[in-house]
Regions:
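N-terminal Rossmann-like FAD-binding beta1-loop-alpha1 element of flavoenzymes
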Residues: 2-29
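Short loop/edge segments at beta-strand edges and connector loops
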Residues: 8, 79-81, 219-221
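Conserved Rossmann-like nucleotide-cofactor binding loop
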Residues: 12, 35, 255
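Glycine-rich FAD pyrophosphate-binding loop
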Residues: 21-45
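Mid-domain catalytic core of redox enzymes
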Residues: 23, 222-346
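Short glycine/proline- and charge-enriched loop/turn segments
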Residues: 43-51, 184-187, 266
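Dinucleotide-binding Rossmann-like beta1-alpha1 core, especially the glycine-rich loop
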Residues: 46-130, 135-138, 142, 155
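Active-site/ligand-binding neighborhood in enzyme catalytic cores
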Residues: 107, 116-226, 251
Length: 347
C-alpha cells in the first residue's frame, strides 16, 4: 500500500484521489481552500447555487461517461440542443452550421468555404502527433488561408493568448474544434450535455466516494513543501505538520512546482519554469432576461476586450427559461501572468 498525497481538490485532484483510494492506497487529499471542487465548486450567487466556471459535456467524452457510471450518477446526465453565435460588424450572426457559414457576410465566399474545410479536417482527424510541432497559425493558414485566420481566428487568439498567440500549438485548436464539432445530433444541430444539479453533483459524488474508500480530505490545508530524501518523496509539509508520503500527485499550477519541491533537479525546475501560463478572470452575471438565444457567442468585434460570452442557462436551466427567472452569463477575460491586471487583488 502506497502512502499517497494528492495536492489540490479540483476535479482532476478529486478524480486522481478517488481512483487511488479505490486501488487500495492510503490517500490524503489536501485543499488550500475551504471547499473541494476547484473551478467545479459551486458558490451561492444571491440565493442561486452556481459553478465558479462554466463546464459542459460533449458526446465524445467517453472517459467522463465511464466515471459517471462508476460513481453511480450517470442518470444525472442531460443532453440539450444548443447553438452558437458570432458577433462582428456590430451584429450577432448565427454560427455553427453550414447554412450560417454561407450566410456570414464578414468573409469572402472563398474564405467561408475554406473555413468549412478547417472545421471538416479537424472533426475527421483522429491523431494529434503531426500537429504538435506546428503552430495554430501555420495550420489554419495552410488549410483555411490568410483571410480565414486574420478575420476569424487571430482576433480570438490575440484576446486569449496575447504574446503567445502566434506560437500556440495546432494540436490545441484541433482538439478543441474536434471535440465540439463531433458533439452533434446532425450536421445542423449541436448537442451538449450537463449534470443535473451542476458540477457540484460530480464534486459531491467524488468526495463521498473518496471518503467511503478510506480517503482523507483535509480542507483549508495548503501544501507548503514536498520533502525528499535520496531522490524519493518522504512527506508533505502543511501548516499543521508533515504528512508522511511515498508519492505525491500535484494538480497545482506548474509555475508553483519548483517552489513546492525545492529538491527537484535544476533541469526539472527549468522545465517547469519554462511552461508559460495564462490566467483567466471570469465574470458571472445573473440577469432577468436572456441576452442571446445561443449558448456560446464568439466575438471578433474591434474594441470589445473579451473573445466571447457563454450564456450558461441556454444549456443548463437555472431559472432562465421561466418568466422572471435568472439568466446566467459567463464572460471570461484571459490574461498571461505577465499582464498588469493579473496582479490585481480580487477586490
Amino acid at each position: 500500500m502506497t502512502r499517497l498525497v494528492v495536492i489540490g481538490s479540483g476535479a482532476m485532484g478529486l478524480a486522481a484521489a478517488w481512483e487511488a483510494a479505490h486501488a487500495g492506497h492510503d490517500v490524503t487529499l489536501l485543499e488550500a481552500g475551504n471547499v473541494a471542487g476547484g473551478m467545479a465548486a459551486h458558490f451561492d450567487f444571491d440565493g442561486l447555487s452556481i459553478e465558479r466556471f462554466y463546464h459542459f459535456i460533449c458526446t465524445t467524452d467517453f472517459a467522463t461517461f465511464k466515471l459517471l457510471g462508476e460513481l453511480g450518477i450517470a442518470d444525472s446526465l442531460r443532453w440539450r440542443a444548443t447553438t452558437m453565435g458570432h458577433f462582428s460588424g456590430g451584429r450577432l450572426h448565427e454560427w455553427g452550421n453550414p447554412v450560417a457559414l454561407l450566410r456570414y457576410p464578414g468573409m469572402s465566399l472563398w474564405a467561408r468555404l475554406r473555413y468549412g474545410v478547417v472545421e471538416f479536417v479537424s472533426t475527421r482527424r483522429d491523431r494529434w502527433d503531426a500537429l504538435e510541432t506546428q503552430s495554430a497559425r501555420e495550420w489554419i493558414t495552410r488549410w483555411g488561408g490568410t483571410e480565414v485566420y486574420d478575420k476569424m481566428w487571430k482576433p480570438l487568439f490575440d484576446l486569449k493568448f496575447y504574446d503567445y498567440a502566434d506560437p500556440i500549438s495546432a494540436a490545441w485548436i484541433w482538439t478543441r474544434v474536434k471535440r465540439i464539432g463531433r458533439s452533434r445530433k446532425s450536421l445542423f444541430e449541436e448537442k451538449l450535455g450537463y449534470l443535473e444539479g451542476g458540477s457540484e453533483t460530480l464534486v459531491t459524488a467524488l468526495a463521498d466516494g473518496f471518503a467511503k474508500a478510506g480517503g482523507k480530505l483535509r480542507l483549508s490545508t495548503p501544501a507548503l513543501r514536498v520533502e525528499t530524501e535520496g531522490g524519493r518523496v518522504t512527506g508533505v509539509v502543511t501548516p499543521e505538520g508533515t504528512i508522511a508520503a511515498d508519492a505525491v500527485i500535484s494538480t497545482m499550477p506548474t509555475p508553483l512546482v519548483a517552489k513546492l519541491v525545492p529538491d527537484l533537479p535544476e533541469d526539472w525546475k527549468a522545465r517547469y519554469d519554462a511552461i508559460a501560463n495564462i490566467g483567466v478572470c471570469c465574470l458571472i452575471f445573473k440577469l432577468g432576461r436572456s441576452v442571446t438565444p445561443h449558448f456560446w457567442v464568439n466575438i471578433t468585434e474591434p474594441g470589445v476586450p473579451v473573445p466571447g460570452i457563454i450564456e450558461f442557462s441556454n444549456l443548463r436551466p437555472v431559472g432562465g427559461n421561466t418568466p422572471g427567472g435568472d439568466t446566467i452569463v459567463y464572460v471570461p477575460y484571459y490574461m498571461p501572468v505577465t499582464h498588469e491586471k493579473f496582479g490585481w487583488s480580487d477586490d
